Amino acid sequence: MAQVVLVFTTPIYWYGASGLTKTFIDRWSQSLRENREEFLAKFATKTAWVIGIGADEPRTKGLPLVQQFQHIFDFTGTKFAGYVLGKGNEPGDILQDAEALAAVEDIRSKWRL
């Protein structure tokens, strides 16, 4: 895995990650069974961000999602750089969330993307 920074994005479903995101992470178990030391050594060199979008008070009710990822990153030794929680339910809704967009722009400026 050549990437230095990992960005995990998910809609917030029932105060946690989507089923697809959770399944992706659950699949790591196979790698941990077969190549645990190598897998964890690679993740320990990474920095990760979390971006979650939800409709129902995401900046408060999305915090369990953030905490879940904090535990995942603690387990894998991955540096947790931060998170952005935005408000949206329909396609394009996030464009009305100035706070989330500003937070993402701040991250982008640090990466010079």
Q: Model-flagged regions — what are they?
A:
Residues 1-74:
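Helix-loop-strand module that forms the ligand-binding subsite of alpha/beta enzymes
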Residues 59, 67-113:
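Glycine-rich phosphate/pyrophosphate-binding loop and the adjoining helix
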